[in-house]
Amino acid sequence: MISYEPPPSAISNPTDPGGTTIIQGDGENDEEEDRDIVDAGFNPSVPGAPGQTDTQIARRLVKGKKTRRILSNKPQDFQIRIRVIEGRQLPGNNIKPVVKVSVGGQTHRTRIKRGNNPYFDEIFFYNVNMTPLELLDESVIFRLFNSGSIRADSLIGEFKLDVGYIYDEPGHAVMRKWVLLNDPDDSSSGAKGYLKVSMFVVGTGDEPPVEKRDREMEDDDVESNLLLPAGVALRWVTFFLKIYRAEDIPQMDDAFAQTVKEIFGADSDKKNLVDPFVEVSFAGKKVCTNRIEKNANPEWNQAVNLQIKFPSMCENIKLTVYDWDRLTKNDAVGTTCLSLSKIAASGGEIEEYDSTGTGSSSLEATTEKEVGFLPTFGPCYLNLYGSPREYTGFPDPYDDLNFGKGEGVAYRGRVLVELTTKLDNSSIKKIEDISSDDILVVEKYQRRRKYCLCAVFHSATMIQDIGEAIQFEVSIGNYGNKFDSTCKPLASTTQYSRPIFDGNYYYYLPWSFTKPVVTLTSYWEDISHRLDIVNILIAMTDRLQSNISTLKSAIQAKLPDVRLAEIWMRLIDQLIEDTMRPMPSLEGKANVTVLDKQRDKLRQTSLKYIQEAAIKMRGEATDVKATLTEIEDWLDRLQQLSEEPQNSMPDVIIWMIRAEKRLAYARVPAHQVLFSKTSEEACGKYCGKTQTVFLQYPLDKTKGLKIPTELRVNIWLGLSEVEKKFNSYSEGTFSVYAEMYENQALLLGKWGTTGLLKRHKFSDVTGSIKLKRESFLPPKGWEWEDDWKVDPERSLLTEADAGHTEFTDEIFENEARYPGGEWKKADETFTDANGEKSASPSDLSCPFGWIWDDDGWMRDINRAVDENGWEYGLTIPPDSKPKSWVAAEKMYHTNRRRRLVRKRKKDPKVSTTSKAALTPQEQEGWEYAALIGWKFHITPRSSDTFRRRRWRRKMAPSDQHGAAAIFKLEGALGTDMTEDEEKKGSEKQTATNVFGANTPIVSCTFDKFYTYHLRCYIYQARGLTPLDKDSFSDPYAHVSFLHRSKTTETIRSTLNPTWDQTLIFNTIDIYGDPHAVAQNPPNVVIEIFDYDQVGKDEFLGRSVCMPMVKLNPEVDIAPKLLWYPVMNSNKHCGDLLLAAELIIREKDGSNLPILPSQRAPQIYMVPQGIRPVVQLTAIEILTWGLRNMKSYQLASVTSPSLIVECGGEIVETAVIKNLKKTPNFYSSVLFMKVLLPKDEMYVPPIIIKIVDHRPFGRKPVVGQCTIECLEEFRCDPYLTKHEDAPELRVARLTSSPLRDVVIEVEDTKPLLANQLQEKEEEVVDWWSKYYASTGETEKCGQYIQKGYTTLKVYKCELENVSEFRGLTDFCDTFKLYRGKAEDSDDPSVVGEFKGSFRIYPLPDDPNIPYPPRQFLELPGTESQECIVRIYIVRGIDLQPKDNNGLCDPYIKITLNKKVIEDRDHYIPNTLNPLFGRMYELSCFLPQEKDLKISVYDYDTLTRDEKVGETTIDLENRFLSRFGSHCGLPQTYCISGINQWRDQLTPTQILQNFARLKSSPPPVFSDNGTRLTFSSKDYTLEEFENNRKIHQHLGPPNERLALYVLRTQGLVPEHVETRTLYSTFQPNISQGKLEMWVDVFPKSLGPPGPPFNITPRKAKKYVLRVIVWNTKDVILDEKSITGEEMSDIYVKGWIPGNEENKQKTDVHYRSLDGEGNFNWRFVFPFEYLPAEQLCIVSKKEHFWSLDKTEFKLPPKLILQIWDNDKFSLDDYLGFVELDLHRTTIPAKVPEKCSFNLLDQDKHSKVASLFEQKSMKGWWPCHAEKDGKRILAGKIEMTLEVLNEKDAEERPAGKGRDEPNMNPKLDPPNRPDTSFLWFTNPCKTMKFIIWRRFKWVFIGLIILLLVLLFLGVFFYSLPGYVSMKIVKPNL
């Protein structure tokens, strides 16, 4: 299918109010193109979020649409670059994070880091080759793991987004943004940290933007720099996707098993051979419904629940219906998508209009809240499209279509779904059943209405695949599909017709005045409330698009401002009128969904904004051109508003069927042909109108190389209740017939039914279905109008002369003899070509409508015959005629014959519609065939054995009249069934339906036709593709219009042919209303071919033009020639300048314009008034020379000359005798006078050919070039200013005022000055200048404060800087091409032409003198020896070449045969090397002009790989007047790092510049502080007014001269950024180089000293950390006595130097979290003060050959641990300090709180490098239950010393010697601080006694008391008894 959009220069057809665009609509394709547009989301809880959050989101919703539509469907090279910079706030304790990044099946990971805020700064490259649409569907997945965990839960968090999201960002890049990580499996979890990343999508020819790494400018506030702004909070939402049911699922399984069941008597169901289930996928998650076996209309009634973070970075919810297979993989039935950007709105879409500055702001701010809504959809059906429905049992060649890859060619069912979104993160099932209440609710959305469709086929032309008869089928859904048995048989197919020749090249179907009609009824939901609005918005969009095209044409044509303002005002007024028109209301509609209401609200609000913005623009705009951007934004917005995601009505599909096989198709969106009773605007664009439809092959691999056919079809679709409205749209008279064929066979010389074999006496057209007259029953509502009649189908019986205007009749004269006898007349004297007996030539008459073109029959001797035309043969029995013939007579020959021919031509007096009277034989209506199934013909032959004739019976409607009666044709006409067949009634019915034999035949008869006259003015083409080996083509064009075509003449050996030809189609009969034809005229299709003498002509391209229709020829409107694109396989292959006009013609042709003049017989030129107006023009050609000419036919190009062609004029240079020695032309200027069009749009190109003069007179074309745009070479020859005069453009070749220049440099500086300079160079160097220029002021030291100047850093190549005009101001470089373009590739470059052109008008009066010549006083063409200095600063983002994702780059310089391979200075393991190298070599220009700088990857064992290369044209830099050979610095310095390096002083350069400008020399005064130049006065004071004067400056006159030079637009001192390219991925950046080149001609003396750009060396520093005390440390252990305690020690290191970890001794038994240490850590490190980064060099693995250098920010990590002797130590907490932004500590521990570590802007920080030392308390933190807690406080002294200070003030680690600066005494720890089992006595004293002493004392007292009591009670009885015995004792 071809869709065509006019170029911006095209104008609208004055008789076509609908514009000039004929586009075959394609709803599914649009959906595919837009389905990748990135969703930016919406958060209803934050409607008024700060900043422009919603606006940014809305722009993401909008902006993808513009870029996506221009994407190719051809696989291309792409490169995705992902840079992982750093992490922040990662959860976990003592983690070792690693990031894995996955894109398109490729995964890369970072190095393992330590800590919760790791710094990675690693870049990954992903090279892919796929189509852009496939690429944009790919996902980028960031996964963060804890590498120290071996558990399954090592995943910390992840983040996903589509590649399409990145592609839609400015520059296709997301730079230095934070992404929020979350747990994909736990919706209740919060943020899992942040990653800062940069992402780029680099396509062919794209330049990735350069990252700016400004530490001061970079925002460390994560929330404000999130990829999704903080105002739109990420929330967990649940998508409830309810999948109710599906219908019309096609057969997917083989019927073999069902057939076996049937054999054994089991039930079978062949209609439901499919086991469907639905797979839902979104953002990497997939959920499947249940499988329902053997059901083509399954009901799942299940809800899929998808929990995601919203707004989502992924766009499409993809639904794929699969057929389950037990043994093989599941087959896809079809795929459809829900695009979030279409079913949700953020509310920011409206705000974007205000941001443009012209929008209105009348709506309240709450409008955003009102129009924003979460994703919602349905209940609504989603249609599935894919491969054809017919099941074959073989692998489906179109299976990719079922996965949504490409445009589906057939309807494959539909799925009823509903989507709702809830702000809920509760864990629920992934899939659950839908409640019965919900199933009942959805019933009202399934109510069906009857729709009627009628399609009238007006023409089918441009057919090239001929053979079998052709018919067309129209279907909508399954209705009308002739191969499907699920619907009633309908009159959905046309009759079979055979194509006939159009007399020139194509074939067409001869429908004449009887047009085939198809009609069908179908049942769908009434969604008119959606489609009415869609059609209204589309009409509005089309009008705006047409008006914009008219406005652009007017701007391009440079119309007066007044006329321009009128066109613009008409556009604005039309837009305001359109947007003010009310939209249809949704009130009262039964099946309105939530999405309908929300989109209606969004549309109403958007239209109001556009309306108010247009009103405001109308009153305020002053510049028409400046408003175009905003108007086009409105157009984009309207196009988005016109999209309808809930379009459940399937497309109308037209199939071209040949031999019962589907050949080609076209899809027409139903809404385009739908009738609406709402209003005329709400009707479809082509409803009831004849439109042009180009069919296309399914999955066409040739991408439109051949058009199957061009259809003109009128389609009407409407509800059955309004079917009578069809009467007002219909034209002609509709006729309905039932038909059958009577068959007979020839048996024993008689015709009868005996030998029919399996054929029936009466059958359908295929002969396979038996029919009887009596069994035909008219459909309900119809009745017979007539009896059965014989009615032959003439369109199937075309003769050989059909369609020809000239034809040659032939007849053979036959003679026979016995061998050796005399020749006599044969029995059958005259026969035709088939050997059938024929009448004699004298008896043959000319057929009706033809006249003889010559006098009589002539012998044909242009064959393999003798001089009399005879050819001879031998008859061998049983044959009666010879099988072969020869030209020479032999004795044994028995037969001879000769061919008699006579030409005839069409009789112009006989109308094409006139027909001859039928003979009696023809009236019988029989058509004959040699065998059953063979092609039929009218005239009987002796070899015929089968014949048939068609019987037809006309029907008429019984209860209603008018064209709408055809919609009653529903159901079968009836068939005859035998008893056996009745047993298989269902199968017979299926077969009948399959062949469609019992459906009525509908046709539309036109009683009247109109004769038109077409003139196609083909003027010229440009930029065609070369298809011949000589680098050119021989183009000619076939021009097709309806059933006629003509061919232009062939133009030899050109890619820019000028045909200047008018093709006249004298009489073309078109049936239908002329006004309808004027509104939608047929297309003029031009196909351009390359003529080849041998082989088939090759297709160059196709162009489509809309003719201007003149219904009133008296109206004096001439068509305008316009450029139309020539397309081949969706590739632009040139342009064609043409116009066409279609004039309604009177019978006698009296109203036609006069014929144009003839250039040759029957070749008419383009007439005056249409052809361009020309003017005598001078073209001066500067032919400077040829470069880099490649060999031709294995021989070098040695003696070339140059030919210039333009407008039919040719000039040629002299021959270069030896190209290698003298590549320049001896005579450099050519002059030619040409008649060129005044309008720049019509100017022909300049063609350059290079001819090599070789021995023996051979002059092959060895290269050619076409210059299409000549406007840049136009000039005013009388211009008095001479800044741009060519003779003034050479500043170097003639810039020496003196022949010898001697520069003497004496070292007269005192010793002290030299010492001062050396010291200064330690403070500032060239890198200081570089970083000051790039804005990285933190790296440049005191450079700016000293008053030094900066240089210019260009982010592109110097020649691409716009103000330097490509450095081609003296001469341009034109690429020369040669050869044939194959496989859609461009021809190869075989050389370069150095030259230029000057084009200016010449006076028409020969007496007026010609203007002065432009190319004068040219420099000499001799060679120049030069010194070249190449400075390589650094590489940026080089393509990795090693397995570790890095490379080892080094520089290789190539200049002709000179090579510098700097392999020894490779830089290991980096993608961003700092080279800092300067190379110097000499060369001769122009022979050695191409300087090639390559970057290679160093490999020890294998061959070094090339990363990429860039090439610099030194000749252009040398010749350019912009002084690009050596950039001018800002100041003139005679010493220091900015010392002058050019050969000439500023005053000398200024004198040369004045001479080249033809200005007076500069005059100095006031001791060189005042200068007069070009009539302007300059003073030194005005340039140095606020500038600091330093000791390195030169004399005042030189400084002033330099300041003046810098005002003249010359190249400043600079560093350019050059992109590296590789042949592996051409046109895709492989990285960049920052560098510059100086070129010094040796004739001017030696240059100044070069710059020293050697990279800086890191300095050694020492960080001393004294850990004094800790406090409030978490008590992690319990002692044996039950006390909480910790054995505290502190561990510390600098990131990158983990192998130098240090730790204190252990403070045992801390009972209150206090620890005393007095311990010193000493961390040596290498540091770059200027860049504020640490340099770490170490081997990544033990097997690594080189150390890898890392640059890391200086940080200190300290951790507090609890010591365990018998288990692993316990981690308690940590603190991480940035030495550049060190948190100011608290002086006392009471003020040391957790707030000190908050990363906000109010934190007090200081640089330790500036403060040198700081002391105080810092808080440590840990994580517990997902929250950060205070883990303790640590008192430290931090001190940074350089190497010298460290040596002067030594200090040892810990408390080792030298223990000084300061001296650390052992800590005064409590007596309880010791290891308990090493000191039992201390354990008893300090642990047991201290805690249990009172227990012990109590126990002793208790023991004594008990002992006393025991003794007492022991001795008491004895004492008592003794007292009793001896009381007196």
UniProtKB/Swiss-Prot annotation:
* Residues engaged in binding Ca(2+) 3: 1028, 1034, 1090, 1092
Compositional bias, Basic residues, is annotated for: 898-907
Q: Where is the composition biased (Acidic residues)?
A: 27-36
Q: Show the stretches that span the lipid bilayer.
A: 1894-1914
Q: State the source organism's domain of life.
A: Eukaryota
User: Is-annotated flag, keyword Membrane?
Assistant: yes
Entry's family note: Belongs to the ferlin family.
Instruction: Give the protein name, as stated in the record.
Output: Myoferlin
Q: Which source organism does the UniProt entry give?
A: Xenopus tropicalis (Western clawed frog)
Q: What is the lineage of its organism?
A: Eukaryota, Metazoa, Chordata, Craniata, Vertebrata
